[in-house]
Amino acid sequence: MSEAPSASAARSGRDLQSLRGFMRRLSTGMLIFSLGLGLGIYAQHRWPIGRWRDERASRPTVAGRTVAEIAQIPRERRLVILAVGQSNAANFGETKQTAGPGVYAFADGSLYAATDPLPGGNGYGGSIWTRLGARLHTAGDFDAVVLAVVARGSTRVTDWAPGGADHERLVATQKQLTAAGLPVDCILWQQGETEAGWADASGEAYFAALKEIISACRTASPDAKFVVAQATFGAASPSNGQISPAQTQAAALPGAMAGPDLDRLGSGFRSDGVHFNDRGLAAAADAWLAALRPWLTQRSTTLPR
């Protein structure tokens, strides 16, 4: 005997209700997974040192010399570098290195051994700066090289401009160095990959924000040279052609100069299409040194002795 129409309709209604409940649970699960994945990526790039993956990164080794001792070295025999930008300035390199004697990392008013990952960046790998510091010291021009890093992965130029999330830290670090008797000699800007990966990012807006950053740094560190690298390379995404010219334009501003063209270091120098592998870290340090050399030579002839 066939099932009554009313019973069949009731069963179909229950089946439909059950299916809808399953779909709601599935959608909720996918939403939670997506949120968790997004928060994980966000945290990897934005949480401060010591809060993600490796607790040892929060305990850098105290340097064998004090801030006061380094501050007593004549300025022509010491160099204070402030490195600013996104992940390629923030310890996201493939291999770690120790700069060795005579090179120091500055953070929160203290000096530490210049060992990757450097304090002030939110990555846990290697950096250009330990390698650059070692090259500068080995050349014999300086008795001490001080590296201060203020860098965070995935940041935009507007994050560093007045009103941005990282601007106060940028200015505060310069004030700390000045108060410690170690005024900044040069500010190395390595940022731009974020905007270069966005098709709708404006070169004009990038230049305007970077101009504000340079102006603020000139106020905080009047004698510092602001050095702008060409940094827009990303193998996985098409490059926005407006950003590199904006960096060139900013390098011509008063108090600024052109740094290295790191876009020449293509996929063979990258571990994942963006961040530097061991070969890339060495090549980037060499490129920074070559770009700084003419200015360093001029600086040595103009500083009071």
What residue ranges belong to the model's regions?
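N-terminal Lys/Arg-rich, disordered targeting/topogenic segments
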Residues: 1-23
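Cell-envelope and extracellular/periplasmic
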Residues: 25-305
